[in-house]
From Swiss-Prot:
Keywords: Cytoplasm, Protein biosynthesis. The lineage of its organism: Bacteria, Bacillati, Bacillota, Bacilli, Lactobacillales. PANTHER family: MITOCHONDRIAL RIBOSOME RECYCLING FACTOR PSEUDO 1, RIBOSOME RECYCLING FACTOR. GO terms for cellular component: cytoplasm. The keyword Cytoplasm applies. Gene3D superfamilies: 3.30.1360.40, Ribosome-recycling factor. The keyword Protein biosynthesis applies. This is Ribosome-recycling factor. Residues 135-156 are annotated as: Disordered. Pfam families: RRF. The gene is frr. Transmembrane segments: none annotated. Its main location: cytoplasm.
Amino acid sequence: MIDLKEVKERMGKVSKAFQNELINIRAGRANPNILNKIQVEYYGAPTPLNQLASVQIPEARVLLITPYDKTSLKAIEQAIFASDLGLTPQNDGSAIRLIIPQLTEDSRKELVKQVKAEAEKAKVAARNTRHDFMSDLKKDNDLSEDSRHRTEDDIQKATDLEIKDIDRIADIKEKELMEI
């Protein structure tokens, strides 16, 4: 027997993962979440940046990274250089400033393409989840034909809702990116 609660829960995880991916797409404004994936080599172990420093937003397009331990400043700077952020850290000896450049029209369009690609991946993940549940349903011989069709309809409705949610989230991000 398929639990619809589990279907909705797994579908919800798809849009949550999609939202987390979109956080990493910068929109010309300072957002500390763009630093979430940065690992700093600290005493020989890769350590998340947010465990080594506080990140503040003093201005709309500036991130200020203040390490808890000043000796980690150079390692943090190197990790930012090595990342795929495309930002140049400015080290003033006690903190690092990251200036987020204004997006050009071309870079905005490129980021919108990236959002659409991520949205498509999320939709595929939702459809794969639907496929998994439909396969499980076909294997369940204890269900009557009516129950099976009703459950298939419910799974399809959950998938359709998830895809609508993904489209809504993508539209919001696209508008944010195209905003000047």
